[in-house]
Amino acid sequence: ALGAEVEIEKVIGIEKLADGTFKVKTEYNEYQAKSVVIAAGVKHKHLRTKSGRDDLVGKGVYYCAICDGAFYKGKEVMVIGDGNTALQYAILLSSYCKKVYVYTLFDKFFGDDSLVKTLRGKDNVEVRPNTSVTDFIGENELTSVEYKDKDGNVCYHEIPAVFVAIGQIPDNKAFLPLVDLDKDGYIISDETCKTKTDGLFVAGDCRTKPVRQVATAVADGAVAATNASIYIESLNN
């Protein structure tokens, strides 16, 4: 309605030209703009296994229960993680899966008490604390998981699907050196969502901030867009 054009492409770099405009490079094209708002979000943190393989992702190993959980209706599944996302995944999966095993590194959850209480009330959920998943096994699809129990014993669990929820990480290297990153890789900005480069703004989970929720991301978008507009107007004066 507002004339925006959407291009589904991966950005591989941003450059500020001598005339003050920005050149945004993607895998296929280059775009020029007077101002840019980075809203790259974050990506799921992948579980490091001893084999280092990622070929089973989408073939039994998943990072989004909302997207892929329904494929395993009536079957047994596993959730790896101990935070809010893992709790939410396990609760969701328990509503249509035969059995949900939750593997956690520690003997407690690091999530909201209300979610923990809800999970504990599910008859088809089994929590296995103090376990460390070390590898995914299978040729063309996942067949089992290798893990170490609290005593360090190597064990195996036959399971058709695993949902990993061990956190999220930013991927902001493409925007260097026009931005500064904190120690965790998030883009540093001020309260106007401006980065260290004039005309370059950032919004959402990819920037340094104390709270990462939909509400704060939407607020960032409004702030960044407003200040990008102000910046463009200043160029015309």
Map each language-model feature to its residues.
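A Rossmann-like FAD-binding core segment of flavoenzymes
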Residues: A1, E5-K25, E30-A33, S95-D190, ...
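Conserved acidic
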Residues: S35, V42
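Redox-cofactor binding/interface segments in oxidoreductases and associated redox assembly factors
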Residues: I38-A39, V79, V164-A165
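FAD-site-proximal beta/loop scaffold in flavoenzymes
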Residues: K43, T49, D54-F71, I166-T216, ...
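Residues that mark the start of a beta-strand
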Residues: G60, K75-E76, K99
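Glycine-rich Rossmann-fold phosphate-binding loop(s) that bind the pyrophosphate
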Residues: G81-G83
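N-terminal Rossmann-fold NAD(P) dinucleotide-binding loop
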Residues: A86
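Generic hydrophobic/aromatic pocket-lining and core-packing "Φ" positions
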Residues: A90-I91
